[in-house]
Swiss-Prot record:
GO terms for cellular component: cell body; cilium; cytosol; extracellular space; mitochondrion; nucleus. Binds 1 potassium ion per subunit. This is NAD(P)H-hydrate epimerase. Belongs to the NnrE/AIBP family. SUPFAM superfamilies: YjeF N-terminal domain-like. PANTHER family: NAD(P)H-HYDRATE EPIMERASE (PTHR13232:SF11). It catalyses: (6R)-NADHX = (6S)-NADHX; (6R)-NADPHX = (6S)-NADPHX. Its cofactor is K(+).
Length: 282
């Protein structure tokens, strides 16, 4: 009951029976060119080469080169990644297709850089016309993350004190959940409070959008018994676990890879159309 009172205090609990979450899935993407591939692992670039799916070791090596060789900063890449995530969400679930106005979104952030991507994503979702709420149970005491929290607070984005304990409560309150808990560098067992959070997410009927890796999945092998997102936003390049993704929408985001780095790792990234920062792989 304390969790319910917290939610009521935020003015987020909506009376009445459960509403349908998505009334239509309107396509906002450009018409697919004739060379567009439909197979998950066989997504083709214009040159005909398959986009490379990275192992955990390869993903870490690419990240380190971006930071060390190319002198990108963490906050710079985080901003670009978070914007890509919000853009992909707006394409898959445009506000006009949702039953609430503005559409309600719960963004669950973990303690690492994936959580930082989620904070940036929430800020851009607010600018795109959504009503995000953030649950951020383990906050790092670092200037980068405290700054991101302040930015969200200044934009009147609420932070939950407790995670709704039952899937039905989340289904009633929100039309979409963004999973920004763990990224590709996560290893080991999932500990509390995130084990309980993932248990709640596994029982949802509203769609889940996972950033880079569905939380709780092995970076290369996936997890058939874990959460099953409807949208996956791969960042920089897809990871091998994405071959096990069975949802409706798979976007590639993070249009910041230097051509020389792409060539070195044979990423075969697609040609993003015009000024787009995301590319639909599936």
């Amino acid at each position: 009951m304390s969790g319910l009172r917290t939610l009521l205090g935020l003015g987020l609990l909506v009376a009445g029976s459960r509403l349908p979450r998505v009334i239509s899935q309107q396509s906002v993407c450009r018409a697919r060119p004739i060379w567009w591939g439909t197979q998950r692992r066989g997504s083709e670039t214009m040159a005909g080469a398959a986009v490379k799916y990275l192992s955990q070791e390869e993903a870490q090596a690419v990240d380190q080169e971006l930071f060390n060789e190319y002198q990108f900063s963490v906050d710079q890449l985080m901003e670009l990644a978070g914007l890509s995530c919000a853009t992909a969400i707006a394409k898959a679930y445009p506000p006009t297709s949702m039953s609430k106005s503005p559409p309600t979104v719960l963004v669950i952030c973990g303690p690492g850089n994936n959580g930082g991507d989620g904070l940036v994503c929430a800020r851009h979702l607010k600018l795109f016309g959504y009503q995000p709420t953030i649950y951020y149970p383990k906050r790092p005491n670092k200037p980068l993350f405290t700054g991101l929290v302040t930015q969200c607070q200044k934009m009147d984005i609420p932070f939950l004190g407790e995670m709704p304990p039952e899937p039905m409560m989340v289904d009633e309150l929100y039309e979409l959940v963004v999973d920004a808990i763990f990224g590709f560098s996560f290893k080991g067992d999932v500990r509390e409070p995130f084990h309980s959070i993932l248990s709640v997410l596994s029982g949802l009927t509203v769609p889940i959008a996972s950033i880079d890796i569905p939380s709780g999945w092995d970076v290369e092998k996936g997890n058939p018994s874990g959460i099953q997102p409807d949208l996956l936003i791969s960042l920089t390049a897809p990871k091998k676990s994405a071959t096990h993704f069975t949802g409706r929408y798979h976007y590639l985001g993070g249009r910041f890879v230097p051509p020389a780095l792409e060539k070195k790792y044979q990423l075969n990234l697609p040609s993003y159309p015009d000024t787009e920062c995301v590319y639909r792989l599936q």
